[in-house]
Regions:
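Catalytic core segments in nucleotide and nucleic-acid processing enzymes
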Residues: 11-165
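Feature for intrinsically disordered/low-complexity regulatory segments and propeptides
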Residues: 1-10
Length: 165
């Protein structure tokens, strides 16, 4: 692991890749808080079908985020990937870009199909983990993170902006 300072940071990373379900949501919230990324939990169990989060990155419009985690090595399918679109429409975020975080991964047929939508991307946990690590290191700004996430299709580590010195 790269320059991860302290046991708490290492635990964040380990939990991010290991946990599923509600525990995964909690570690996701902890990481956002640690990185000082503003978010609002929308799915508080009082609103039927609400998306999970509204993420507010610096100098960027809000993003509606849905977390989909699967047990073992199962992949998030098309239907689960696009649920966030309906949830965002119903709950008043019809103009917001939507992201489905697929943990551990997304079915490979999904990104090409959803790219035409123009308002949705999927990101696998390993790719988002790399991006968040770069935010922590200061080599990726929140605005750059937004631009990377808000590109229709799939947000891949290979597409992250690199820092020139």
């Amino acid at each position: 692991m790269r320059n991860v300072r302290g046991d708490a940071n290492l635990k964040f990373l380990q939990d991010f890749y290991k946990l599923r379900g509600v525990e995964f949501e909690q570690v996701f919230e902890n990481i956002l808080s640690f990185l000082k990324i503003s978010f609002k939990k929308l799915d508080d169990k009082t609103k039927t079908g609400a998306p999970d989060y509204l993420i507010e990155l610096q100098d960027s419009p809000p993003i509606v985020f849905e977390l989909k985690s699967k047990l073992a090595d199962s992949l998030v399918d098309y239907n689960k990937s696009v649920e966030v679109l309906a949830a965002s429409e119903v709950h008043g975020y019809k103009d917001a870009f939507c992201v489905t975080l697929c943990h551990p991964g997304v079915d490979p047929s999904v990104p090409i199909v959803i790219a035409a939508c123009g308002r949705l991307s999927v990101v696998e946990s390993n790719d988002l983990g790399e991006a968040l690590l770069r935010v922590c290191e200061g080599t990726l700004t929140q605005a750059q993170l937004y631009a990377w996430l808000a590109s229709p299709g799939q947000a891949l580590t290979a597409d992250l902006p690199f820092r020139t010195y």
